[in-house]
Amino acid sequence: MKLYVSLRTLASVSTLVVATSAFVSPGSVKVPSFSSSLSASDGEFDFDVAIIGCGVGGHGAALHSRGQGLSTAVFSGGDVGGTCVNRGCVPSKALLAASGRVRDMKDTAHLESLGIQVDAASVNYSREGIAAHAKNLANRVKGNLENSLIALGCEVVEGRGMLTANPQEVKDEATGKDVILAPGSIPFVPPGVTVDEKTVYTSDGALELGFVPEWVAIIGSGYIGLEFSDVYTALGSEVTFIEAMDTLMPTFDREIAKQAERLLIRDRPIDFRTGVFASEVTPGIPGVKPVTIKMIDAKTKEHVETLEVDAAMIATGRVPNTANMGLVERGIETNRGFVNVNGKMQVLSCPEAEGSVPELIPNLYCIGDANGKMMLAHAASAHGISAIENICGRSHEVNHNAIPAACFTHPEISMVGPTEEQAIEMAEKEGWTLGKSQGSFRANSKALAEGESAGMAKVLFNKETGNVVAVHIIGLHAADLIQECANAVAAGTTVQELSMIVHTHPTLSEVLDEAFKGAVGMSAH
C-alpha cells in the first residue's frame, strides 16, 4: 500500500496555509521545490528517511538517521523543538528556576539557619524578566536543535506533512524510502471550558506568564499542575486545585503522593477540591471580572460549588496531534487519536480489539506522544532512535519500564517503573514476592548541609531474583538521582550488586545507597 502526504507550508510566522503542491509517502515525500545535495543510498528515492514533525522525538530520529549514514528530510511544521522546547519542558524549567530563587530568598527561617540574614520584604522580582528568561532559553535551545540538524546535513523543511490518497493534486516532490510520524501532542481542553489564553489558559499560555494572578485555580493535579503550583505560590499567588479523582496526584505512587501533599501543598497557600469536575469555565477580565468555575460531583454529576478566581489553568493532560494528517483516509484507525504501533514503532492499521486484526503498514513508523506509549520527551527521543534502528534492519524495542520520569517541583519527585500498588498486583499475578526498602534524606549529610532534608527514596524489588522493579524518590535533586535507578532497571542489576557499589560521600546519592543496602539486610554508613 502506497501512502502519500501533502504538506502545509508556513506563509508567515503566525499563519499556516495548505499547499497541495507537496506530499510525503513511505515511498514518497512531496514538498515545495527545494534542492538538496543528499540522495538515498539506493538511488530510487531522494531520501532514505522522511520525518514528519521535529520535536524531541523527530529531532532524535533525525540525528540517529544521519549518524547511520541515511539521507534525511525533516518536515518541522515551523516548530523545531516541538512542545518540549517551545511550550513545555524547557521554558517551564526556566520559570521553576527563577521562581524557586524567589521562594528561597523569602524563606528567612531557612536562610537564618545557615547564618544568612535577608529582609524578605526587600525581595522583589520582575514578571517580565522571568518571562523573558523562559522565552530566551526556549529560543536558544531551539536554535541549538536547528543548528545540529543543519550541521549533520539534514534537509529541514518548514511545513507539516499529511497523508493523502490523491497524489495527483500535487506537483513538486522529493521521495523518501521510510516515513516517521512524529506530530507530538497538544493540551486537552475538557468540554465546557472556554480558553481565551488570558485568564483561562493551558500550559501553552501559562508559560508566557502574562500576569501573576492573586488566586489561580489549576484544573488537574498531575505533573504540569504541580509544577505550575510551585511557580505560582513562589511568586505570591494562592492556588486551588480542582481534581476529578478522589485523591490528588492520582497517577503517582500513593506513599510518595502523601509526602508530596505534605511538602508541596499543605505547607503552602494551596487548597483543593477532589472528586469534582470543572463542568463550566468562563473567562474573566483581569482586575475587572473574575473567572467563573462551576463544579459538579464526579459521580453524581450534581452541582456542588461555583468558584470565582482571577485565573484558571487547564492542566488536564494532552492529546495526540494527529488530526488532519489523513490517517483515516488511508485506512489507519486511531484510538482517540493515538496511532497504534508495535514494539518496533511500526504503524498498525487499527488498535487491537476483539474482532479486529491490525495489519502492518509497510515503511511507516510513529513515535512519541502520538503513539501513546509514554508521553515524555525523552521517551519520544528513544522511540525515534529505535525506529531508525529497525529501519536499518537491527531489531530493537524500547523498554518503557526503564524510562524515568520527574516532576520538577521544590523538592523534586522522580520515578522509574510501576507504583507500589501496581507492583503488588504484578507480583501477585506473576507469582513472585515483592520486596521494599527505603532510604531517607533526614540522615543524609549533604541534605542536612543544605538544610533540605525532607524526603525519601523507595526501592521495590523482586525478592527471588533481586532485580529492581521500581524506584520512587521525593527530595532534593530527585530528578538527577533517578537515573542511577533507571540504569539499574534497564541493565537488570540486582539489589545485591547495587548494595556493594560505592557512592560518593557526602552526596545525596547515599540516600539510594541506604535503600540498596537495606534491601539485602545491610546497614548504610
Where are the model-predicted features located?
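FAD-site-proximal beta/loop scaffold in flavoenzymes
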Residues: D196-P213, E308-N390
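N-terminal mitochondrial targeting presequences
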Residues: V24, P32-D42
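Short hydrophobic core segments
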Residues: A50-I52, G161, A174-G184, I218-I219, ...
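Glycine-rich flavin
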Residues: E44-F47, V56, L63-L70, F75-V212, ...
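N-terminal chloroplast transit peptides
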Residues: M1-S28
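Catalytic nucleophile loop
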Residues: G58, G222-G225
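Gly/Ala-rich phosphate-binding loop of Rossmann-like dinucleotide-binding domains
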Residues: A62, R66, S229, T233-A234
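Flexible, glycine-rich terminal cap/loop adjacent to redox cofactors
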Residues: I52-G57, A61-G78, V90, A94-L95, ...
